[in-house]
């Protein structure tokens, strides 16, 4: 077993895991499209996103400093959680009998370690293809690894397409003064995914090892059209229409996966 690296002082490495998670569906009528946006806004509102991120904090073994969250009109939500590696000791101002901070001041002492999430519901103006995007950033400073949150987040959002970026920045020193620009072995983000996740997705890596930069794209392998239909489309489509919608949805997924417009 490899021995732990002895450090001089605090571990100053910053590890950041960034997700772009996409969920695709087809909503045939304008009424269904509006209903889809309202559904997403209710299912993934700021309160539920806070619960999900709180679970992430527990998974990576961190401690919550502060939470700020917001639902947006007409659509979308965001949550920011500041975290620390060590348990937080209450300050005198926190335990004395005095008014607490105003909402506007809650993020005044921004910490290096944080988790953020933003949601972006979107609908094609003509084709009825609806895309729900979730952007998540987990940034930690010290020995805490954000990679522990991978499987949980991918499954929690029932992801069709996922792009994941992981980078390590800064350096820390050992007791002899030697710099270390990464404190763990990693060849691919895929190594941190469970077997069922790896089997369920088509995956592509683009890694720049010398820069401690790792990138993985994921596309769900199994396609069942009924899982992508919303509203009237779940029962009103003819076999020919189902075939057309299947082509539209798959085309949308491929464009997002490859990150460019693809000719039909």
Swiss-Prot record:
One of its GO terms (biological process) is spermidine biosynthetic process. GO terms for cellular component: cytosol. Its EC number is 4.1.1.50. Is synthesized initially as an inactive proenzyme. Formation of the active enzyme involves a self-maturation process in which the active site pyruvoyl group is generated from an internal serine residue via an autocatalytic post-translational modification. Two non-identical subunits are generated from the proenzyme in this reaction, and the pyruvate is formed at the N-terminus of the alpha chain, which is derived from the carboxyl end of the proenzyme. Its cofactor is pyruvate. Pathway: Amine and polyamine biosynthesis; S-adenosylmethioninamine biosynthesis; S-adenosylmethioninamine from S-adenosyl-L-methionine: step 1/1. Heterooctamer of four alpha and four beta chains arranged as a tetramer of alpha/beta heterodimers. Catalyzes the decarboxylation of S-adenosylmethionine to S-adenosylmethioninamine (dcAdoMet), the propylamine donor required for the synthesis of the polyamines spermine and spermidine from the diamine putrescine. This is S-adenosylmethionine decarboxylase proenzyme. It comes from Pseudomonas syringae pv. syringae (strain B728a). The gene is speD.
